[in-house]
């Protein structure tokens, strides 16, 4: 009897928990950059990837800015090195920054921007 009660309880609770988790909406972000002018823009917590890209370009402010990185439900960072710019995503700001500096792989790399969704 007790096993049947626990089983019924589990069958009732687990789907409710799964529904709660799937009800959390995705949040999107983007980083735009124009290397020559060092202009950048970030967007985060947008309901759609396109919204994030449009906002990042708007924040960048230069006509020749480009979206260099898109991310979802996490963080992203942008670093500029002697020859190129790099971007990376991570679950946290620290993880994204660590990844991008490793990818840049130069002592002269500098962090330019970062952003995280909720």
Label the model's feature ranges.
Residues 6-18:
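Hydrophobic h-region of N-terminal signal peptides that target proteins for export
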Residues 2, 17-118:
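Helix-coil modules at protein/domain termini and other flexible surface or pore-lining loops
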């Amino acid at each position: 009897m007790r096993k049947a009660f626990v089983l019924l309880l589990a069958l009732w609770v687990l789907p409710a928990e799964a529904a709660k988790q799937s009800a959390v909406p995705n949040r999107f972000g983007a980083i735009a950059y124009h290397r020559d002018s060092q202009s950048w823009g970030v967007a985060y917590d947008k309901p759609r990837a396109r919204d994030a890209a449009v906002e990042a370009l708007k924040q960048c402010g230069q006509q020749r800015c480009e979206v260099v990185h898109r991310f979802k439900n996490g963080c992203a960072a942008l670093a500029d090195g002697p020859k190129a710019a790099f971007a990376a995503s991570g679950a946290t700001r620290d993880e994204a920054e660590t990844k991008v500096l490793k990818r840049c792989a130069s002592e002269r790399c500098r962090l330019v921007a970062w952003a995280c969704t909720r």
